[in-house]
């Protein structure tokens, strides 16, 4: 039996094509994935991301616990509402999950992936046993992402909270006032566009979705969410990183806080050894302007370089009009490579793993 978000009936009524996504019955599109993609790049689109797992960490040991649990350092969060992107690693340095952690007034809030929920909660709870903390999953909360160059203005029109005007990127704030209990609005996203991710009580989500649709925000499915994040060069768990892939290989080295040197975090010893030895593979972007679409699991080779790489995510880019991909390749690969597709060899350009930000080509 697939799980349903509080917006399930609305998705069905609005023509959403529902599919199994990590055990959840979610809309992949509402008719045209490409139109939904363009709506986010050029205007404002909204996504139901209530399948994400929200976990609050409270107690006197919360800070020390998260400084041990996460590769990034929550001590970087100086003000309530500030957010940090991080990997949660195993002892071998592999990525159990990637997540966002917020500093809250009464502790911390984690937002983790839905497909890894059971694994994540088991790991968090097992590691928490040594600390004075309480781990609280918040299944009663829903989450709606509103993304695009017009997204913030649309949300401001509805909510009218002056505090949102001052919100900086990667910062969130709890709303106050009648009707806004347990609302938390963060200037974060997974599209390469500006916007908000709104965490709110499940019973309030339907009205917010309907109100956003009424003022012209386009409902978008998971298909557009994937092409948008891929254009932005953002990792997807299970593709660009997993339990056997370290953040150093997955273009996430910037999320590892090495200082202060005395901070011990899970996976630090393994990452230190890997860093000293030098990584064997790296994550790159691929661009193919010919006919055809690059797809995950296709092999990548480079003339004169030993070893074989693999595409981790690939798609047709609606913004650029040709195919792009992320690939894990040997470090010796430079600016040109070949993707082997059946009996064809497609010549591709290698770039840094980011293609589009704020609607503009960045390579």
From Swiss-Prot:
One of its GO terms (biological process) is glycine decarboxylation via glycine cleavage system. InterPro entries: GCS_T, GCS_T_bac, GCST_C, GCV_T_N, GcvT/YgfZ/DmdA, GcvT/YgfZ_C, TrmE/GcvT_dom1. One of its GO terms (cellular component) is glycine cleavage complex. The keyword GTP-binding does not apply. The keyword Cytoplasm does not apply. It is an enzyme of class 2 (transferase). Keywords: Aminotransferase, Transferase. Its EC number is 2.1.2.10. Gene3D superfamilies: Aminomethyltransferase beta-barrel domains (3.30.70.1400), Aminomethyltransferase fragment (4.10.1250.10), Probable tRNA modification gtpase trme, domain 1 (3.30.1360.120). The glycine cleavage system catalyzes the degradation of glycine. Belongs to the GcvT family. The glycine cleavage system is composed of four proteins: P, T, L and H. This is Aminomethyltransferase. It comes from Teredinibacter turnerae (strain ATCC 39867 / T7901).
């Amino acid at each position: 039996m697939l799980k349903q978000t509080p917006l399930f009936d609305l998705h069905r009524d609005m023509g959403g094509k529902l599919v199994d996504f990590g055990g959840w019955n979610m809309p992949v599109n509402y008719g045209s994935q490409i139109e939904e993609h363009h709506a986010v790049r050029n205007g404002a689109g909204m996504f139901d991301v209530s399948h994400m797992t929200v976990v609050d960490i409270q107690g006197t040991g919360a800070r020390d616990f998260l400084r041990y649990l996460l590769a990034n350092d929550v001590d970087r969060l100086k003000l309530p509402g500030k957010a940090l992107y991080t990997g949660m690693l195993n002892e071998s340095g592999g990525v159990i999950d990637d997540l966002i952690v917020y500093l809250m007034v009464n502790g911390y809030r984690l937002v983790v992936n839905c497909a890894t929920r059971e694994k994540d909660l088991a790991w968090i709870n097992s590691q928490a046993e040594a600390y004075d903390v309480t781990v609280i999953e918040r299944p009663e909360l829903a989450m709606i992402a509103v993304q695009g160059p017009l997204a913030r203005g649309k949300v401001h029109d509805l909510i009218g909270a002056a505090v949102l005007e001052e919100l900086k990127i990667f910062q969130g704030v709890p709303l106050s006032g009648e009707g806004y209990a347990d609302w938390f609005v963060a200037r974060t996203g997974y599209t390469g566009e500006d916007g908000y991710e709104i965490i709110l009580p499940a019973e309030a989500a339907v009205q917010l979705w309907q109100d956003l649709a009424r003022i012209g925000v386009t409902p978008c499915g998971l298909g557009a969410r994937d092409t948008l994040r891929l254009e932005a060069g953002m990792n997807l768990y299970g593709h660009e990183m997993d339990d056997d892939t370290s953040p150093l290989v997955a273009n996430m080295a910037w999320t590892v806080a090495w200082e202060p040197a005395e901070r011990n975090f899970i996976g630090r010893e393994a990452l230190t050894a890997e860093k000293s030895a030098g990584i064997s593979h790296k994550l790159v972007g691929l661009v193919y302007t010919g006919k055809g679409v690059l797809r995950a699991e296709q092999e990548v080779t480079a003339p004169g370089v030993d070893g074989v790489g693999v595409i981790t995510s690939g798609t047709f880019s609606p913004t650029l009009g040709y195919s792009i991909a992320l690939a894990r390749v040997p470090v010796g690969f430079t600016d040109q490579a070949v993707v082997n597709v059946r009996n064809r060899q497609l010549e591709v350009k290698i770039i840094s793993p980011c293609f589009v930000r704020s609607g503009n080509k960045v390579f």
